[in-house]
């Protein structure tokens, strides 16, 4: 197991597209070779070495490569995007698309992330100690194939459009969420430990949502069916169980229609 | 660019227009044209061990206009598959960012065609009302020369004239519309069917009645064919037939083709056909439903082979995730009901409509696999490759950037079998098609006929494109293929056609080693039929605008000069 340390030396004038900052790209390369890897700043092709000092060599494979960014990446996009194994740790904040399309490995951001964190993710794990902006684990704009697998855990709060078109995997937001949770989802699980303003599960076909706080405005397409006790991410509680979205088509299994389930902690 | 002298030395030249098949020859270029010889100071391009062909000619592709743009808006996710967005080389040469896969940006469209060595592309469906937009996009597409076919098959004026079989009036209307829209010829999409779609109906057979207009698809087709020959246009009618994409549609296809029997081509451009039947793959199916869906490519081609006054293009399914878009509005709604993906529809006043739906052609879905085989079979059953052209009906059956892959499949049985072997329903595909039993492998000469000499002749453009004879435009593509020692690995054929070693457009080197070097000097071609005015038609058109049947006034309808700033106008003297 090798660790490559990137230390930020300069704040990019425009956002820097750090699509090369993945264990897959670093594997098998020396520190000097890693510093030569490309990234765009606007329309200009720059090098990682223009913004970071690099120390340590990559491991033989992505799985043997850890990346440690010892500083802030508020203006660096695509950290860990499309990675398949290994790990990336960012000591500060990160910009958009952290762990987007990732298939495996782990990304840890100790600060906040911007939008599109874990977009269309297929596997692996993303942990954010701070908060996230919008579109956590959602589908790319226009696409109808969202997050398929893996785990995203945001310790702080998140904005809107969480898990849009989700098909699988788990998203846990420990703080509050604004609006649009699991819109169009056909699978997967979202756990919100704080409150949600509204629009939870709109046009949702299948999948699970747990809200441990309050939903200020419920969607009219959800119907309360019973009250159940469940343990969710280490918290045991009694939930009001809703099914929906009743306005949407639903698949049948063994002659019965399958609905999405929304569990809201009983007050 | 003009002036510079260039000589392409020592390549294996393939030019069906001069019956040259792999002879080692030099090609001389001066002032943007091919010439007999040049001076000793000419720039030398070494083509030794490489294949030299004319620039490619694409007879049918949806690359510009409101329909394509609606597709771009509907599918932002298509940009995820753009490939190389911004190479450092591109940046150095100062050219524009590329985006999109099945509906590429105008810049990517021009660059990708140029990288494949294509010189001319026909935009296959221009709604006349939207012609200004089509021309703006054409103008913004670098390098390649383009023209656009306005759609006539569901036009209210045309249907009014043809229900009384007024061919001369129809011709006068066509002549007017080609002029004001800067169009090239007569496109017909689902004749009568798209008009019927305004009533929620369709025309699936030749004798179905179009609601309100009291006319049939057959009358529209024969009437427009007569009007086209009356005018003597460079291209024939260009037909997307009725009942596209449905099981068991091949008898309608053959019946439509039969309408050309006995009709003679009348033009001064060397065109011999009176009907071009486009994306024939979508029209060559048997079976009573999707369960019994099968290829009828052999039956259709048996007819095409003996009927000399028709030409076809393939519309090959390339097994990609793509975006379907056509003026066949009812078909797109039908497709949306089949695949449940997002759908949009556009209605163009008195003229036409369009629908758009994303589509994923999967080798493991039986009907898609049969479609894949059907497209290739059409070419493999064809006897006259000069009447059979390679297309993917871009982007409907696949993006145009897959032409090299289609060429590979046509040239190499092993590569076809390799695809077949990975199909989930291989045995069922073999039962429903002929592809497994066909051993034919096309050669480079036949590929040059299908992509160069053939389409240029069918478009009436053989005096500019499609060959390497002196006097033609100096559009020359050089591919890294050894004619005498063709690669055993079929992937190398695809790679060679994907990125030309060189492409010269109008005598200027625009691509080298598959990289675009310059934006070139593109032209927009349109046809100007000089027909005497018929007062009734002039009155009908101005009355329609005056009464407000259109949302624009007649003075805002034509395409202004500035929208097509590099025109090449083909004048047609109409002898009544």
Per-region residue spans from a language model:
Chain B
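Active-site microenvironment of metallo-dependent hydrolases
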Residues: 1-25, 29-30, 39, 65, ...
């Amino acid at each position: 197991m090798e660790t490559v340390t990137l230390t930020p030396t300069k704040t990019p004038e425009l956002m820097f597209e750090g699509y090369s900052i993945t264990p897959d790209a670093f594997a098998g390369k020396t520190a000097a070779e890693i510093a030569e890897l490309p990234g765009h700043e606007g329309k200009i092709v720059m090098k990682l070495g223009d913004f970071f000092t690099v120390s340590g060599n990559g491991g033989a494979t992505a799985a043997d490569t850890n990346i440690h960014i010892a500083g802030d990446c508020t203006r660096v996009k695509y950290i860990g995007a499309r990675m398949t194994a290994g790990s990336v740790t960012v000591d500060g904040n990160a910009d958009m698309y952290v762990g987007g399309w990732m298939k495996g490995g782990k990304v840890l951001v100790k600060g906040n992330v911007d939008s599109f964190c874990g977009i269309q993710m297929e596997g692996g794990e993303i942990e954010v100690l701070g908060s996230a902006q919008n579109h956590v684990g959602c589908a790319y704009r226009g696409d109808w194939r969202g997050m398929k697998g893996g785990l995203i855990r945001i310790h702080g709060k998140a904005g809107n459009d969480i898990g849009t078109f989700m098909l699988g995997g788990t998203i846990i937001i420990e703080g509050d969420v604004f609006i649009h949770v699991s819109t169009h989802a056909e699978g997967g699980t979202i756990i919100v430990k704080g409150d949600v303003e509204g629009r939870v599960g709109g046009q949702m076909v299948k999948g699970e949502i747990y809200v441990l706080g309050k939903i200020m405005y419920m969607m009219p397409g959800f119907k309360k069916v019973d009250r159940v006790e469940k343990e969710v991410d280490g918290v045991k509680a009694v939930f009001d169980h809703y099914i929906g979205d009743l306005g949407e088509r639903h698949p049948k299994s063994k002659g019965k229609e399958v609905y999405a389930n929304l569990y809201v902690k009983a007050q | 660019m003009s002036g510079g002298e260039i000589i392409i030395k020592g390549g294996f030249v393939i030019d069906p227009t001069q019956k040259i098949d792999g002879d080692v020859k030099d090609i001389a270029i001066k002032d943007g044209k091919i010439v007999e010889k040049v001076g000793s100071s000419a720039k030398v391009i070494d083509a030794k061990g490489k294949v030299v062909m004319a620039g490619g000619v694409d007879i049918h592709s949806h690359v510009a206009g409101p329909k394509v743009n609606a597709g771009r808006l509907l599918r932002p996710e298509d940009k995820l598959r753009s490939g190389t967005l911004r190479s450092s080389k591109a940046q150095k040469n100062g050219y524009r960012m590329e985006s999109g896969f099945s509906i590429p940006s105008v810049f990517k469209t021009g660059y990708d065609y140029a990288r494949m060595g294509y010189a001319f592309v026909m935009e296959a469906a221009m709604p006349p009302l939207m012609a200004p937009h089509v021309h703006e996009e054409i103008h913004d597409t670098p390098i390649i020369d383009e023209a656009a076919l306005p759609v006539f098959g569901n036009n209210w004026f045309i249907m009014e004239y043809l229900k009384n079989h007024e061919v001369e009036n129809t011709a006068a209307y066509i002549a007017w519309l080609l002029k004001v829209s800067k169009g090239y010829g007569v496109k017909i999409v689902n004749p009568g069917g798209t008009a019927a779609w305004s009533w929620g109906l369709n025309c699936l057979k030749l004798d179905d009645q179009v609601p309100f207009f009291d006319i049939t698809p057959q009358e529209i087709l024969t009437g427009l064919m007569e009007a086209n020959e009356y005018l003597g246009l460079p291209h024939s009618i260009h037909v997307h037939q009725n009942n596209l994409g449905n099981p068991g549609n091949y008898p309608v296809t053959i019946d439509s083709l039969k309408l050309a029997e006995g009709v003679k081509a009348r033009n001064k451009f060397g065109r011999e056909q009176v009907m071009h039947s486009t994306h024939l793959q979508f029209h060559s199916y048997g079976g009573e439903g999707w369960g019994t869906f099968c290829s009828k490519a052999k039956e259709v081609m048996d007819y095409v082979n003996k009927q000399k006054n028709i030409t076809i293009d393939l519309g090959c399914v390339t097994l990609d995730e793509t975006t379907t878009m056509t003026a066949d509005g009812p078909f797109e709604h039908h497709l949306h009901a089949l695949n449940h993906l997002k759908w949009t529809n556009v209605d163009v006043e008195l003229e036409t409509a369009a629908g758009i739906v994303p589509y994923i052609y999967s080798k493991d879905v039986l009907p898609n696999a049969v479609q894949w085989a059907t497209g290739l079979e059409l070419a493999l059953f064809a006897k006259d490759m000069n009447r059979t052209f390679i297309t993917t009906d871009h982007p409907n059956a696949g993006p145009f950037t897959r032409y090299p892959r289609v060429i590979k499949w046509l040239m190499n049985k092993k590569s076809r079998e390799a695809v077949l072997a990975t199909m989930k329903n291989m045995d069922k595909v073999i039962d429903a098609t002929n592809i497994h039993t066909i051993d034919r492998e096309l050669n480079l000469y036949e590929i040059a006929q299908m992509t160069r000499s053939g389409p240029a002749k069918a478009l009436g453009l053989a005096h500019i494109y499609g060959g390497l004879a002196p006097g033609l435009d100096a559009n020359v593509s050089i591919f890294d293929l050894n004619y005498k020692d063709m690669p055993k690995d079929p992937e190398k054929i695809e790679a060679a056609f994907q990125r030309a070693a060189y492409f010269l457009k109008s005598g200027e080197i625009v691509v080298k080693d598959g990289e675009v070097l310059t934006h070139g000097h593109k032209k927009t071609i349109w046809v100007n039929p000089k027909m005497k005015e018929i007062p009734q038609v002039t009155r009908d058109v101005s009355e329609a605008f005056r009464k407000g049947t259109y949302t624009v006034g007649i003075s805002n309808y034509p395409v202004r000069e500035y929208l097509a700033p590099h025109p090449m106008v083909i004048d047609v003297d109409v002898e009544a």
